[in-house]
Amino acid sequence: MDASADRKSNEINVTMEEPIRILMLFTIMNRGGAETMVMNYYRHIDRNRVQFDFMVHRQERGAYDDEIEAMGGKIYRMIPLHPFTFNTYRKQISDFFDQHPEYRIIHGHCSESGYFVYREAAGRRVPVIIAHAHNAHALFDTKWLFRTYFKHTMRPYLTQGFTCGKEAARWLFGNELGKKAILQRNAIDTFLYRFDEAVRLEVRQELHLSKDVTVVGHVGRFNRQKNHEFLLEVFHKYVQEFNPTAHLLLVGTGELQKAIQKKVQQFRLTDQVHLLGGRPDVNRLLQAMDLFLFPSFMEGLSVSMV
């Protein structure tokens, strides 16, 4: 995060006629924690002065795409980043900046995967390049080596780090640079989450759940990080040994959804586990729950827990 000194001469020009446009980096704008946090801020900023545009890495549309475009944001679609696409992706990023030299602020939310964008932007003397730490560490898998390499080599290209917490900053930026990261709160609109008995009963009626039954809940992507398999094992044991009429609400989508559905069938819990998909009304669904479980392998500061 020491590149800012070399770019002082390349200042951001602010005019009253056009808003400052910030380029946000994401995989896809679905209803994940980081995505939802950015959208919470996006809805409340003065978009006549500051606009968010989004570089995503999936061709399919995300859950927030319509809202982004309605608020004046632009969405640019890149190819997914994989080891076999590095050269093609690097060329695509170079072409993007050839076509869009107007971006003077880059804000990445895809951890070390923003490496190629950060490097290209630094080479073009973009004055503000931010990486945002959202997780405390990465799971060990086939991509771990690449993640570790990019995490270390991206740091000189950054002008600033943002983080949701100290552990997340230390993991992405290292001990020394992590201390300089700016803590940005994972904000929510607290008014929407105030308890309301009428909403609780209404949601339970919609889900065909009685007012007296115990409802356990979880909100999160269906991926390895969120540890749904263990969550189901815990719920299965809870039903068997303590509360045979309990229900479980699973809110989210993801690549492991079919595997989780199969696990539900194996446990013979089809009538008690409700896969609700990605929902825009999580604040309402939370009202129906008595217990919230969150057994993730890793988190920075979860928006679901906030």
What are these regions (language model features)?
Residues A3-K8, I93, R194-L209, Q265:
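A short helix/loop element that forms part of the nucleotide-sugar donor recognition site in Leloir-type
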